[in-house]
Amino acid sequence: MITGSQIRAARKLLGWPRDRLAPKAGISTTMLKRIEEGAYVPSIEQRSALRAALEEGGVEFTNGDTPGVRLKIRGRKAK
């Protein structure tokens, strides 16, 4: 399960303002702000939509010792 902090970090890594991510996930910018701040707990569907939009944008979520997020490595091919 992704956290509001991960969502905010992923959005920042992509350089996306809230008004770019929110419509991709089908939520309002106000709701996105509240999710990122931990003031609103999104539904499973909303979390899935946010995760899908961010992953499509080029990030991947990690869950090692602590939850995190990083940019995907693109265009690398094995020789």
Language-model segments: residues:
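A detector for short, charged/polar N-terminal pre-domain segments
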Residues: 1-2
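A charge-rich, low-complexity, intrinsically flexible signal that marks solvent-exposed coils, linkers
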Residues: 9, 24, 40-42, 63
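DNA major-groove recognition helix of helix-turn-helix/homeodomain DNA-binding modules
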Residues: 26, 45-63
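Recognition helix of helix-turn-helix/homeodomain-like DNA-binding domains
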Residues: 26-42
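Helix-turn-helix/homeodomain-like alpha-helical modules used for DNA recognition
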Residues: 59-79
